[in-house]
Amino acid sequence: LMREIPGMVVINPSDDVEARAAVHAAYDHVGPVYLRFGRLAVPVINDREDYKFEIGKGIVLKEGTDVTIFATGLEVSESLEAAKMLEKDAISAEVINIRTIKPIDEELVVASATKTKKVVTVEEHSVIGGLGSAVAEVLCEKAPTKMMRIGVNDRFGESGPAVELIHKYELDAEGICKIIQQVQRRLSYRRIWQSFFA
C-alpha cells in the first residue's frame, strides 16, 4: 500500500544497526518516508566497519551462483541461514538485503538475476504489493528471469506470537530452504527430460 503513494520512500531494516541508520537517513531525506519494523528480535548482520546505509541501495551479503534470494527486514537473517542449509545440497545461493523497497536498487536486482538466472524474494508481508512485486516489475521490464515469491499468500493475517507465525507461513530458514529445494528439483527434472528428448 505504501509503495503506491507518490514520492513515498519505503524502508524495511534487517536489524537494529540498520534501523538506527535508516532513521538517520529518513531524517535527512527530503520527502515522506515509511519505516517498517518487524516484531522479532533478530541477529545483528550489519556490524562491519564499512557498513553504510543509503536509500535506494541494496547490499550483497553472500555471493552465490545458482539462485538469488532477495530478502527484506527480518527475513534477511532467515535467508542467510537458509543459504547455509542449501549449501549442504550443493545449491549456491546469493543473498541480497533489499533494505529500501522503494526506490528499489534496480541495477543490483538486474545484475544478480542475470548472474544466477533464478530469483526468490522473501518477505514477512503479502506477496502482493511488496518486495516480490517490486522485484518482479524490474525483472519483467529489464531482465526476464525465473522467479518465485515467498511471503504471505493472498489471505488475511493472523494474530499470535511472531515466531509461531513465521514458522506457520514457512518464512523461517527451514521453510525458505525447503521451498527453494523443491523449486530447484523441479527445474533439474525439467532439464533432464529436455536433454533426454533433445
Task: Report each predicted region and the residues it spans.
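Divalent-metal (often Zn2+) His-rich catalytic cores of metallo-beta-lactamase-fold enzymes
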Residues: 35
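Conserved thiamine diphosphate
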Residues: 1-28
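Glycine- and acidic-residue-enriched helix-capping/beta->alpha junction motif
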Residues: 26-32, 135
